[in-house]
Amino acid sequence: MAITISVNGKPRTSQAAPATALLYVLRNDFELNAAKFGCGAAQCGACTVLVDDKPVRSCVTPVSAVGKSNVTTLEGLGSSDKLHALQQAFIDEQAAQCGYCIPGMIMSAKALLDFNPKPSEAEIVEALVGNLCRCGTHNRIVRAIKRAAGVPA
């Protein structure tokens, strides 16, 4: 049975079973590979996407659960001609080392900045509590989010 969901503002159809994790539909059916499989238990944040502007862990979210919601992935931010402010700030602050966590970090940061455009450092850290970086670049990630928000680092 076909399932149609809105991804990055466009309707997309998959033949996946309703219980299939959203992450696998995004990656395998729609070839949107920014969200990553990290733990499979919603503990690391590598799979974070936005569903109706709220961060969700796509590795444990059944595709059927997103229904008529809009799913936004990193690929839906900015364009090849003009990066989203968060993407540019992560580059400018050299926030990535291996880069595996970065899509999830950016999506969590986007949700934060959409809700709170000028967050404090404590609010940024709290918003990222579900996103892990094994390389230890959390300080650069926080600086990048501050830069994107126009908050002095």
Q: Which role fits each region the language model picked out?
A:
Residues 1-153:
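Signature of N-terminal electron-transfer/Fe-S-associated modules in redox systems
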